[in-house]
């Protein structure tokens, strides 16, 4: 309904920026209250989204002077072509959204508050339905597919290693839907994904087996910067969707940024999730190793090619 209102307003010659910002903010309010979050968080999220809508530009790539980034907007972000594996992956998503099984859920991230386990580690444990995990944790279809297109675009002769593979890293496997999207684009690519919750990781593995995807290496346990530094030598594409705190996000990014090359891309999810995540994102944008960033509100993309001037973009999706 909201998208129809926006298109109607455009056809009638209305003020696109203000009207679209207003309508999409109403949509965001609906989503926020559906998630039943506390009112302070709800107000912060809505305000953050409204600010993004009012300041975001370059919806079709206009105003982006870098040919490389303009191509990314045109061929990755705005591409609407589907791929053969996507329909099967979306069926997995539907099954997860209807899965009433309960599992022991372990959280090492923003959801733990000040709780501490018996062994002294900061973690939270409770019983959750798989369907609830899916509703809260799975990336929306359009973003998961955009990540898949990103992997495909980068692997199309741009980043491939000597044996033709990309090294794709994901922090926060969840139920494995986004992982499947990225891995399915080219079976030669190697995907290393990290998940803190053993029960959730097992379900993700079941999903990949059902899809026939075999190029995923899932590593289970608390995700630490030391672990990443030890495990990874090279990063072509990275997706950070774990531990939505300032400390965790900065630690992950700092390690990954030492493993990249000029054509690598790091994607940070939920950059406006809370004040801590926004602080982490702002510091990432200012990092001297970074040349360009794209704020899509839901996620941010980080580029490292020194051939282009440093520039930060906000784009409406």
Predicted regions span which residues?
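Intrinsically disordered, low-complexity segments enriched in serine/threonine/proline/glycine
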Residues: 10, 18-19, 162
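A short alpha-helical cap/connector motif
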Residues: 23-239, 243-265, 271-317
